[in-house]
Amino acid sequence: MSFNIAVAGKGGSGKTSVASLVIRYLLKNGSGPILAIDADPNANLGESLGLTVEQTVGLMLDAFQKDKINIPPGMNKQSYLDYKLNEIIIESKGLDLVTMGRGEGSECYCYPNLILKKFADSLAENYAYTVMDNEAGMEHLSRRTTQNVDGLFIISDHSVKGIRTVARIQGLVSDLKLVVKRQLVIINFVPTKLDPLVIEELDRLGIDSIATIPQDEEVYEYDLRLKSLLDLPDTSKAVRAVNDLMTNLFKTEGTHTKGGKNDSADY
């Protein structure tokens, strides 16, 4: 049974970087292969992982719609679609990536999301961990792309507006009765400590189960130079913070990883 983590948050919160560092932790400390899913039409998880993405679910569906009259003999429409979907999996050591992307000129992502979710569900049993980087905002929640997950990581930048977005995401999860075993709010880009105004807003909205990730010049430099965040050194401040929160998560869940306990995550 795959352990499923979904990463959500508003645009600019650094959710893709957090997803990449979660994957980095699992590669180093996990006990099995990882399926990474970039469910954001504005796909860039592959770049953060140092993987070249040439084909996506969106582009494949466009081609499939044009070519479905040429389904090979002995295959039906669904089996041919499954075959084409398997072609877009990018394989690397301990990690496979599937990217949703977008079709040519299509503005509606409901169908690609549905196909991606069904495909990911069918693949999950082959992986110890699944990490899904969702599109910015809350639309993926209303489409129920994000449910049946063990951990929902809601990412905010270090701002009052970001914290209010977190509250709206949590409210929508509750209203839609999505199946989420545990939620963790992660405040990214924290300078030295949480600003009193941010703390006040967290208290006002009743948001708890908090982890923080400090500003990290190394992450900025790696992104700037299109270097894989998987190659960040263990001394990176962001790496250490994500390692801590992941270790604490698995300790709470009673889930086995190879890693030891760290103590700098702020809950």
Predicted regions and their residues:
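Active-site signature of alpha/beta-hydrolase-fold catalytic machinery across serine-
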Residues: L21, Y25, S48, R144
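N-terminal phosphate/diphosphate-binding loop that engages ATP/GTP or pyrophosphate donors
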Residues: K28-E91
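Cytosolic-facing regulatory segments adjacent to core modules
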Residues: S79-E87, E91-S92, D96-M132
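Conserved catalytic-core segment of NTP-binding enzymes
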Residues: Y111-T212, E221
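C-terminal lobe/tail of nucleotide-utilizing enzymes
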Residues: S174-Y267
